[in-house]
Amino acid sequence: MSITKDQILEALAAMSVMEVVELIEAMEEKFGVSAAAAVVSGGGEAAAAEEKTEFDVILTSHGANKVAVIKALRGATGLGLKEAKTMAESSPIAVKEAISKEEADALKADLEAAGAEVEIK
């Protein structure tokens, strides 16, 4: 003889809250599942698929040719000699922030050609 859904519902209605909790725990254990509601995150995939449009160029090291890197920094940023020297010696430091991908790639190439170690974030 099989039990119908209605009979199960009637049996549940007759149980106390503690008995229902114990039943749920037993069902979780027997079937290897959780009664916790599944969390649905909306928009997470859309945000991940969205391409980054602003980049920061970070000088991680001035390398062996500090003078050439200082000259490249002065040309790229318009800083004075003292400010560019301080920037080169303060690595890691952001050279430019929130710039386009093309501008970031060009700046990175210029600084690397001068001997600096650069990363784009």
From Swiss-Prot:
GO MF annotation, one: structural constituent of ribosome
CDD domains in UniProt: Ribosomal_L7_L12
Keyword presence, Cell cycle: no
Keywords tagged on the record: Ribonucleoprotein, Ribosomal protein
TM helices/strands, residue ranges: none
Pfam families in the record: Ribosomal_L12, Ribosomal_L12_N
GO cellular component terms attached to this protein's record: cytosolic large ribosomal subunit
Alphabetical GO biological process terms: translation
Alphabetical list of InterPro entries matching this protein: Ribosomal_bL12 (IPR000206), Ribosomal_bL12_C (IPR013823), Ribosomal_bL12_C/ClpS-like (IPR014719), Ribosomal_bL12_oligo (IPR008932), Ribosomal_bL12_oligo_N_sf (IPR036235)
Matching SUPFAM superfamilies: ClpS-like, Ribosomal protein L7/12, oligomerisation (N-terminal) domain
Coiled-coil residues: none
Entries under HAMAP family matching the protein: Ribosomal_bL12
Function: Forms part of the ribosomal stalk which helps the ribosome interact with GTP-bound translation factors. Is thus essential for accurate translation.
The protein's assembly and partners: Homodimer. Part of the ribosomal stalk of the 50S ribosomal subunit. Forms a multimeric L10(L12)X complex, where L10 forms an elongated spine to which 2 to 4 L12 dimers bind in a sequential fashion. Binds GTP-bound translation factors.
Family as reported in the entry's similarity comment: Belongs to the bacterial ribosomal protein bL12 family.
Official protein name in the record: Large ribosomal subunit protein bL12
Protein source organism: Shewanella halifaxensis (strain HAW-EB4)
Lineage, broadest ranks: Bacteria, Pseudomonadati, Pseudomonadota, Gammaproteobacteria, Alteromonadales
Gene: rplL
